[in-house]
């Protein structure tokens, strides 16, 4: 497995996932700021030219949710995703996708101080999204009680990012949830890798 990665980007979420899964993988450094990026070769991995990208057995793809789901399903022993026959599978997929389909749009809404028509917007609106998420992660510690999943990893990463840059309100439930996620050994390992990659610049 290869993770196409650039430090100090949202690719950190996928890096964290690889450390959480605990399986062998290689990091392929991608300089998204270099002239000529994305190359045609990289667009065969991720057509949008963004990071992260992922490749396994010669097949490449992008999108954080896809990477997290692929890795979680590839290694069921990690219990990072309910198996397809598990009744919780649908709920897991809902919250795994929530970061990309809802949290990211409403964070932009918050940053830009805009309020699109919540009926027409596919993500609803900021207040409704935050309330739904707060309800989902309460009482915790994770979406499915004591079982940490890839959905928790993605949500924890998104909340941490959003609160750091003022795009998500620092509700106590969010602060506590993100802190629990960041306390995981896999997060610490990913931070160490990130620091080493930054130092290479």
Question: Residue spans of the language-model regions?
Answer:
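Terminal-tail/helix-coil boundary detector
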Residues: 192-201
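GST-like fold's C-terminal all-alpha helical module
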Residues: 96-183
């Amino acid at each position: 497995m290869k993770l196409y990665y650039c430090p100090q980007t949202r690719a950190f979420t996928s890096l964290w996932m690889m450390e959480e899964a605990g399986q062998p993988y290689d990091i392929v450094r991608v300089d998204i700021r270099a002239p000529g990026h994305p190359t045609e070769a990289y667009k065969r991995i991720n057509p949008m030219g963004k990071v992260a990208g992922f490749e396994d057995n010669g097949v490449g793809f992008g999108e954080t949710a896809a990477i997290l789901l692929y890795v979680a399903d590839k290694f069921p022993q990690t219990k990072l995703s309910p198996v397809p026959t598990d009744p919780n599978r649908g709920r897991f997929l809902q919250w795994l996708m929530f970061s990309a389909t809802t949290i990211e749009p409403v964070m932009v809404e918050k940053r830009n101080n805009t309020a699109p028509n919540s009926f027409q917007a596919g993500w609803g609106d900021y207040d409704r999204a935050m309330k739904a998420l707060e309800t989902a992660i309460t009482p915790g510690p994770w979406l499915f009680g004591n079982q940490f999943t890839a959905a928790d990893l993605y949500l924890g990463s998104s909340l941490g990012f959003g609160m750091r840059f003022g795009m998500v309100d620092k509700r106590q439930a969010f602060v506590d949830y993100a802190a629990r996620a960041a306390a995981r050994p896999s997060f610490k390992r990913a931070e160490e890798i990130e620091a080493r990659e930054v130092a290479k610049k």
